Structure formats: structure tokens, C-alpha cells
Amino acid sequence: MIDDDGYRPNVGIVICNRQGQVMWARRFGQHSWQFPQGGINPGESAEQAMYRELFEEVGLSRKDVRILASTRNWLRYKLPKRLVRWDTKPVCIGQKQKWFLLQLVSGDAEINMQTSSTPEFDGWRWVSYWYPVRQVVSFKRDVYRRVMKEFASVVMSLQENTPKPQNTSAYRRKRG
């Protein structure tokens, strides 16, 4: 389903933990990393597509996450010319994305990259909040920057509400 401007409707998913870190996933058989994302099927809402992609790509269901926010607007990126499939009609020149910020409420053990017969990812890790903006492939960087900027206050408020470790001897440093 490509729109009149040549963009494919898509959802993007940022999953965070209580420490304000975000899940960063390695594309299957590649050295590139990104957030989970995927197309919206005909007749499917953005939220329905998000839950479907969440399960297909990282094995999580509704009970494992809580929706914290979604982007106000659709965000677009163009594909580099070398990635455009010119032989398909209509030609897709990029993606228009609705992004969701989710908090993982179950444990890390629930994450499973192998739920699909054709997995998108083969590994993942928690990274600092702004890390993906610097590391994602260049043609997605502007969208990632906008997404992370829009979601930042929500994620930072999670961190503020997370109990801090007690000041025990394990955390003390001798001053001299």
C-alpha cells in the first residue's frame, strides 16, 4: 500500500525500560541496527500494525508493554536511490511512519527475535536514550532525531520516578 506521493505507511517502535534505556536491535545477518518497524496492512490501524509488528519482530504482546506516547504527525524518510525498487508499481520512494513509545513492563526474557519464519533481527541490547540517533543508517537519522526529541520528556519522567540506589558503602568513594 503506497500513497500517491510514493511513501509506504509504516509504524516505528521505541521500547524503553524503567532506566530510560531503549531497545536497539541488530538486523538479521547484518551489522546495522535500528528500532523495530514495519508496514501497515490494508484495513489495519497504526496501533494494530504496531502490536502485530511488535510480536513478529521481537516476540512481545500487549501484556508485555504499555503505550506511553505516539508521534503527533507522520514522519517521512526517502530511501537512497540504490534501495528504490524501480521495477515495482507503484514505486515506493520511502516510508511515512507513525511512531510509538512503549515501556517494557514484563521482563527482558520475554523478548524473542525468533517468532517469525523470516526474522528481522538476530540480536538486541539496551542502549542510552540518544545513542540510536548517532548510530542509525544516515537516511533515517532525521526521523530518529525527531522521534527521540518528541518522546524525550516522557522517557525522562520515567527515570525521575525510578527509585535511586541507596547510598551504601558499595557506592562510596573516598575523597582526598
Swiss-Prot record:
Keywords for this protein: Hydrolase
Annotated Nudix hydrolase domain residues: 6-149
Signal peptide residues on this chain, from the entry's feature table: none
CDD domains per UniProt: NUDIX_Ap4A_hydrolase_plant_like
PROSITE patterns given in the database record: NUDIX, NUDIX_BOX
GO BP term, example: mRNA catabolic process
GO-annotated cellular components: cytoplasm
GO molecular function, one term: mRNA 5'-diphosphatase activity
SUPFAM superfamilies, sorted: Nudix (SSF55811)
Segments carrying motif Nudix box: 38-59
Family matches, as InterPro entries: Nudix_hydrolase, NUDIX_hydrolase-like_dom_sf, NUDIX_hydrolase_CS, NUDIX_hydrolase_dom, RppH
Record has RNA-binding as a keyword: no
Required cofactor(s): a divalent metal cation
Annotated coiled-coil segments of the chain: none
UniProt-listed Enzyme Commission number(s): 3.6.1.-
Function comment: Accelerates the degradation of transcripts by removing pyrophosphate from the 5'-end of triphosphorylated RNA, leading to a more labile monophosphorylated state that can stimulate subsequent ribonuclease cleavage.
Membership in a protein family: Belongs to the Nudix hydrolase family. RppH subfamily.
PANTHER family, per database record: M7GPPPN-MRNA HYDROLASE
Protein name, as recorded: RNA pyrophosphohydrolase
Gene for this chain: rppH
